[in-house]
Amino acid sequence: MKISISNTGLSSQKADVVAVFSYEDEKLLASLKKDLTSQFPSASATLQSEDFNGKAKTAITLYTGIKSMPRIMLIGLGKKESLTIESLRKAGAVAAKRAAACKAETLSIHAMDCDGISAADSSLALIEGAMLTNYRFDKYITTDKDKKKLSTFTLFTESKKTAAAAKGIVNYASAMYEGVTLARNLANAPNNEIYPETLAKTALSVGKSADIKVTILDKKKIQSLKMGGLLAVNQGSVRPPVFIVMEYKGGKSTDKPFVIVGKGITFDTGGISIKPAGGMGDMKMDMHGAASAIGAIVAIAKAKLPINVITLVPSTENMPSGSAYVPGDIITFMNGKTAEIDNTDAEGRLVLADALTYASKFNPEAVIDLATLTGACVVALGGVTTGLMGTDELLKSRIKKAAERTNEYVCELPLYEEYEELIKSDVADIKNSGGRGAGTITAALFLKHFIGDYPWAHLDIAGTGMSTKDTDYMPKGGTGIGVRLLLDIAKNW
């Protein structure tokens, strides 16, 4: 999607749809309606007849009779004193959705000055909302190939200061959109398109376009590193595992890297502890952690942030077969620790364990892993909030602040020592499942056994990685959750 900034007024716009905003304020709304009626007399009847009051996310469409600007959309922002950055994101999303419904290809949005919100932040919010809501995973739909799509987006303002601030965030916004779109596409892709080998090829391709060094460790190398967790989960699949290493060097050579680890289970049947048939098709998204980790490093690189970042992705399928690992097996990980397999559907923590051990070789500044790890997190937090656990207060604080800025909510869960009792084994160091109670916490505690001497945080995106319906700027399907969060963390490191 093409983005441009224009230091012009409303009358100078040339777009299929032009969006302007109004607060829920009688005096301000009356003034705006008067101004619009003066500039566009043909719209006066609609302005008088439509009961538009400026409430948040409400909108009316005015027909101007002007070929270069046939429609003006008036969108409500709600009470002026209640305006937030998230309100602006949602307003941008309303503009893009309404424009798409009109089969518009070009959209201009007015970047108004907002009290208490910087021009850069308000501009970014409008762009985010408009761009993120414009996503559809439709590559396999063979009908309507000629259907018009929104492809050009202009932010216009009469203020030189606002225009300058907006121009300063265009590259960042484009990078964000590219990273989120990549993550969504990877998560939504069917398993016959994205499996370990093709995920690795995708990483190589996007890495080349973003000046990211990509190294693919094959099964032989994985075996030599004694990554027992990744190898055990892979036993049931005819497709070999891969371990993806992506390195972006935007900081100083002496700067320690920020490491992102993403769970890359490209399809999860549950293995021998097989899942119910209902909803199993969604298990193509069990690699959303990997999708977001790859999308995040691409976004960071495209935004040219001055930081060193490494993404690690252990990838395999979890399949049942005569050679699959089974409950009761004991496996040895890269760091020498052993685990009893209680449930083969608790496989994500096994592949992440080896990746967290491998992360130590980079002497990282911090490590954050993302994974669709536990159904328990969905029960606890639903599809709205990501579970956060970790060992470092500063890192968790950075994540929480980024979550507030991006509206990608997180909620911290405790890692109290008493929960360790739930993953004790009689025959190995630990076991891979602690039962139904505190499932999200015990999964994180399992991972804690494999971290090195570095600050670590774990994000359980089991609920937030997939949406069952379209919401404001989150589409149905893979959400791309975590990309904007990680990009914001890197930006403010």
Model-predicted regions and their roles:
Residues 51-52, 200-493:
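A generic structural signal for tightly packed, nonpolar segments enriched in small/aliphatic residues
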